[in-house]
Amino acid sequence: MHISKFKIMRKTMLIVLSVFISISSCKKDDPIYDINQIQSNSYNANKTKLKTPGQYISILYANLFQQALSANELVEITRCIESVGDKEIVHEVIISNFMNKEGVTIPSDSLMRADLNSFIEETYKRFYVRDITEAEREYFLNFFESHPNISSEMVYTAFSLSNEYQFY
């Protein structure tokens, strides 16, 4: 009798163990997606060289006035930049002076607000010489929507002072 109880108990344990193992081992496989590997670069990954003061001023003037800066003015402004230690402040002063000159080619604020998408695209091509990414577009559209007092002059100033604009 003792042996038969042992056999029954053993069979019961085997059945319980089998059921437990089969329940715990039957899992649905996680889906595996085929993803194409692509090489992703930063938007400004190829811009590694810092512009010289002469390059910065020439390009800035061309972007703002849509014409070349005279050699005399270029030398004078370049000397001004090189004579001051804090380049950021000098750049701000130069941009401010350029913005106050006649002949600056900046779209009016009403024109900017009328078609923000094309304004943003043209500004990126003009200053960064590249296309805008969708994330940047979305950011700027939201930014302009939440800041109605931003002018096109402020946008051009910000792009001219940005880190990406300092490199080529």
Residue ranges and their predicted role:
Residues 1-9:
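N-terminal secretory signal peptides that target proteins for export/translocation
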Residues 27-168:
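Substrate/cofactor-recognition hotspot
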Residues 10-16:
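Sec-dependent signal peptide recognition
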Residues 22-25:
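C-terminal motif of bacterial Sec signal peptides marking the signal peptidase cleavage site
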